[in-house]
């Protein structure tokens, strides 16, 4: 009988080509699949909630894989310990669930939350430098917050979708777009029902133009109406972005907020 294993994963994306397998570069998916196949001696595909780009991090990526009955995959707690003992230091399994239910890490997700971290210092502190972007320009956070309001809700985000991709629809819903300031760091919190390719980084790039005074806050409304990515600002760099968490309906809602209180985290 085949069982389904669900993983919640954190990783530092600096050394990887992103989540998805690449023929000439190391990916998070390749590391996990190679390890699982060595353990099970069976070809295993690991499917994630979303494909993070090269250099992008995750605190709460969710993925699943199917495997036949195997003694090493019988207990979720042991799976977690085994994988964490064998994975490199920049990939950590935070939680494991075993289920036979109809769950899909991508299609069962109801919301995703990304965090993009900005440093207000001209040179980020050493322990932050791999996880934040410094625009090296004074930012008006109030203007950025005012601009962010225009993007909350259901809109056609074609102006924020990178070219070269085909989409059945560019309409998405943003439930929240907030800026949280803590000392010299600003976190852009973006929560929605789904995201287009590089959409979050393109939104941050547009907010930075507003913060620098290049455009008024209303410019983001104009961008929405034009539906033209060619007139948009450059994307923010990948290393400031992190997939913070993915939410699912019951019984998988423990992947949502307050995830740090999960009992599995301590095991």
UniProtKB/Swiss-Prot annotation:
Disulfide bonds: none
Gene3D superfamilies: Pseudouridine synthase I, catalytic domain, C-terminal subdomain, Pseudouridine synthase I, catalytic domain, N-terminal subdomain
BP GO annotations: tRNA pseudouridine synthesis
InterPro entries xrefs: PsdUridine_synth_cat_dom_sf, PsdUridine_synth_TruA, PsdUridine_synth_TruA_a/b_dom, PsdUridine_synth_TruA_C, TruA/RsuA/RluB/E/F_N
Keywords, sorted A to Z: Isomerase, tRNA processing
Binding-site list for substrate: 114
An annotated Gene Ontology molecular function: tRNA pseudouridine(38-40) synthase activity
Active site: 53
Reactions mediated catalytically: uridine(38/39/40) in tRNA = pseudouridine(38/39/40) in tRNA
EC number(s) stated in the UniProt entry for this protein: 5.4.99.12
Similarity section: Belongs to the tRNA pseudouridine synthase TruA family.
Assembly: Homodimer.
Alphabetized HAMAP family for the sequence: TruA
Protein purpose: Formation of pseudouridine at positions 38, 39 and 40 in the anticodon stem and loop of transfer RNAs.
Annotated protein name in UniProt: tRNA pseudouridine synthase A
Origin species: Chlamydia muridarum (strain MoPn / Nigg)
Gene that encodes the chain: truA
